Amino acid sequence: MNQDLVEEATAQIKSLDFSKSVVMFSGGKDSLVVMDIAKKAGLNKSVYINSELEFTISRRYVEQMKENYNIEDVIPKIDFFEFCRRICPPSKRLKWCCKVLKLALSMKHAIKTGNFYQLTGIRSDESDRRSKYEVINADPFINVNKRYRFFQVNPILYWSEEDVWDYIRENKLQYNPLYDRGVKRVGCWCCPYTTRSEWELARDLEGENFQKFKNIIKDFSRNLPANFRNRYNKKGWRSFATNYNKIEVLKMTNNKNSFVLEGKKEYLEKIEHLIFIVADRYKIEGSKLYFERNIELQRRQIRLVLEKPLNCVGCDVCTVICPVNALYLENESIKVDPTKCVGCLSCCKNINGKLKMGCIARNYKTERFCITF
């Protein structure tokens, strides 16, 4: 084992403020090495995002590792299968799963605990994209909340896979049993990027959940054109993408800064959850909602905010974007706390990157309720 690599990683970890740092343990070999080096350096604090998409073997392994390491589970409030029903099964082109079940959870945990320096097992030789990473990244993909800065720390960025295994063997670390089954990279068993052998392993090891996912794929295919259903059920779901079905439920008109939304009361009551963000004053009369705004705001920005509650699936992603924590979920529906909202409009500005304007439903649901103007 190259001890210089270990010393460099140790020094990097020791340079951090431990009160603001945490190891993001995935159950894989790379983050295992980081977690062990961090513990020896004095940082025995790890988080495992338990999305319940990992192999059962992996989750049991993480439980065993808690005997030697301080690992906290972070679990989504709504499970993967329910999100599949509310949004769609994930695919290579509709990758909502990582945003909802990984990224947003890690951001919420950082905001809650103050652990904004997240140590990972990322290595530069894993992909072309990761070869461009630095040891400490002010992650541009998750810096959408202007109040906080999130840092990704990669202590073993320049290690090779052989270096990782050498460290594990020399330190007699207990690694994930999945590697002994030929798995190259520990991850989600139902990932659309899985190889054929990994898919077969999932079928063998995750029998009940595997069948549940297959049934969800089959149920979803019933809404597709007849000539595509069979292909979708077999392998087509992996690369699936389609134009969404636009369901117009409200019509918006305006005269300068006076606006009228017209439609069924049930939809008006939903947008009432967020109307405070874009309106100085408002009232509902029958099938119409009247509101005024003194500061000029583009209609598409107003629509971006008000379509959130119309399509909300309870994913919690948009709440991590608000810099004053004014957005929250109640009964799995997005709402705003008027006592916290400062009118910064972060929730309706164009947010590039992984969180896609902070609304998973507006970007990935195949049927979306819309406001027209």
Tell what function each PLM region has:
Residues 302-305, 322, 336:
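Intrinsic-disorder/low-complexity linker and hinge segments
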